[in-house]
């Protein structure tokens, strides 16, 4: 009898050990609460690994990182992943909640026909700021000048950070000059690069990892960051009852927008569980938690009734038609332009 019990325990342990889903996703996107809800439903374990930029994600995968089931790249990262033969085509028949996604987020240049990806949220790259300091200094956070104009930056020198991400920072500089965030024009790239070089001495750091905290505690006054991260910084400062308030806003020159999508790795150890997870995240109530908990924009129409009312008036979360017209989705630039941007970034970082 004891032998049978021991065998049962061993078999159960092995079964449970195999029922693991490996998630490779952005920092600060899906809350622990949502992950635990999925684990309870599927009676499985989710092991998550995080990254702070697409460059970091692609570098890890290029270096041979494996064993992931579901990944959550920005849309402009899908094309490189397909070219690297790292994704499997999706079986739409297994995704019964796919119908919930707003058609305007489907069938994009990044993935025509959504053969490989399903959008689950979006973020806007914009300015987050300390309301008290910005008001005191008479600065305008609705213009990219607060990040790129040396005359403006002189008032907040050492109190500004930008993402450590060439795709986002160069795109913002391009929009500042009225160019497309997806420009392939070498003259426009040079103008954006020169602007960043001129602004860099006034910045405290390139920071994609700790800028939420730095802004929320008052060490930094202005950041170029992601809308969902800045939602968290605003919430953290409020919860901590700081003597100042944090806010974030769109820029009048326009902003880059990135939709994040679920994909399944070509060598996924547990593809069945991957489909189950994606379908779970496409349910209206579960998708809404990404917005309610993390402040991300929501392409899922079934989620909107469950989004907290006060968030529906935040332009970076639910933009109106006029605001949407100034949001530009970032796309893959192709190898040649990508190299040019990376070379420009190296010049910027090395101070050449």
Locate each region found by the language model.
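Mature extracytoplasmic/periplasmic domains
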Residues: 265-326
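A ligand-binding cleft/hinge motif common to bilobed small-molecule-binding domains
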Residues: 77-80, 222-243
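Extracytoplasmic ligand-binding site segments that recognize negatively charged/polar headgroups
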Residues: 78-204, 209-216
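A bilobed periplasmic-binding-protein/Venus flytrap-type ligand-binding module shared by bacterial periplasmic
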Residues: 128-133, 175-178, 258-270, 289
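Early extracytoplasmic/lumenal segment of secretory-pathway proteins
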Residues: 18-84
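Periplasmic-binding protein-like
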Residues: 100, 189-198, 204, 242-263
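Conserved C-terminal helix/tail region of periplasmic/extracytoplasmic solute-binding proteins
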Residues: 213, 321-352
């Amino acid at each position: 009898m004891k032998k049978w019990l021991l065998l049962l325990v061993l078999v159960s342990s092995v079964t449970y050990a195999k029922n693991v889903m490996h998630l490779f996703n952005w920092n600060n996107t899906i809350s622990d609460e949502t992950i635990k809800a999925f684990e309870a439903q599927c009676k499985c374990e989710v092991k998550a690994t995080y990254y702070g930029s697409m460059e970091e994600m692609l570098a890890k995968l290029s270096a041979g990182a494996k064993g992931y089931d579901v990944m959550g790249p920005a849309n402009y990262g899908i094309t490189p992943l397909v070219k690297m033969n790292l994704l499997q085509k999706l079986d739409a028949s297994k995704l019964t909640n796919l119908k919930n996604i707003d058609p305007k987020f489907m069938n994009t240049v990044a993935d025509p026909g959504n053969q490989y990806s399903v959008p689950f949220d979006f973020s806007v790259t914009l300015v987050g700021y300390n309301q008290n300091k910005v008001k005191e200094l008479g600065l305008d956070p609705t213009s990219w000048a607060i990040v790129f104009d040396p005359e403006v930056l002189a008032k907040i020198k050492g109190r500004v950070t930008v993402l450590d991400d060439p795709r986002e920072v160069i795109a913002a500089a391009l929009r500042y000059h009225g160019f497309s965030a997806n420009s392939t024009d070498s003259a426009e790239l040079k103008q954006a690069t020169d602007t960043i070089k001129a602004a860099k001495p006034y910045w405290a750091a390139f920071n994609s990892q700790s800028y939420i905290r730095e802004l929320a505690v008052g060490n930094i006054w202005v950041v170029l960051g992601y809308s969902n991260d800045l939602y968290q910084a605003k919430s953290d400062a409020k919860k901590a009852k700081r003597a100042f308030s944090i806010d974030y806003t769109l820029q009048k020159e326009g902003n880059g927008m990135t939709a994040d999508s679920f994909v399944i790795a070509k060598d996924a150890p547990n593809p069945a569980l991957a489909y189950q997870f994606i379908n779970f995240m496409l349910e209206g109530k579960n998708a809404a938690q990404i917005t309610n908990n993390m402040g991300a924009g929501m392409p899922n129409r079934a989620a909107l009734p469950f989004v907290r009312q006060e968030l529906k008036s935040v332009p970076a979360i639910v933009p109106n038609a006029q605001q949407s017209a100034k949001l530009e989705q970032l796309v893959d630039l192709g190898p040649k332009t990508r190299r040019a941007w990376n070379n420009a970034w190296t010049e910027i970082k090395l101070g050449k």
